[in-house]
Amino acid sequence: MNPALSAVSDACERGKVVNAAWRRYGAINSLALAALIAGWAGSRTGEADRKRLSPREQGLRSARDAAVAAVAVTGVAAGIQGVRFSGMEPEGAVPLENGSEPDAGASPDESRAKRRLNLLGALHLASALTLAGVNAALREAGPGPGTGSRRRRFSRR
């Protein structure tokens, strides 16, 4: 979105455009977060008893639980902070230099709020990437047909 915002000459108009786009994206992001949590809860109830898992699998399962929690907490926190930030000016017209940086005309409170929002967004991305990595490791470590490394599956033949 940042390259397209360079065509908007007024800093307050850039804020309106960015906040309007994020409001629409927020609904989709909320649905995605709900689906992630529902999928995690469903898979968690259907998993093997902890006693039947290897120590590595137990550790990965705990890491996945922590990563899902981090994705949920940072996602909700970013959503709340985004709504607060957008509400600092009528129609979300907080002066922005681009999609990520406050304009010089932004108040100190607005600048701090934007920096917090950027930090929460980065933490949310990092937690989502961590979750993807843990899920990949679990897929490799998991027992049963269709799981484990290819090398291990093919060496059985």
PLM region descriptions:
Residues 1-157:
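Short amphipathic, positively biased membrane-proximal segments
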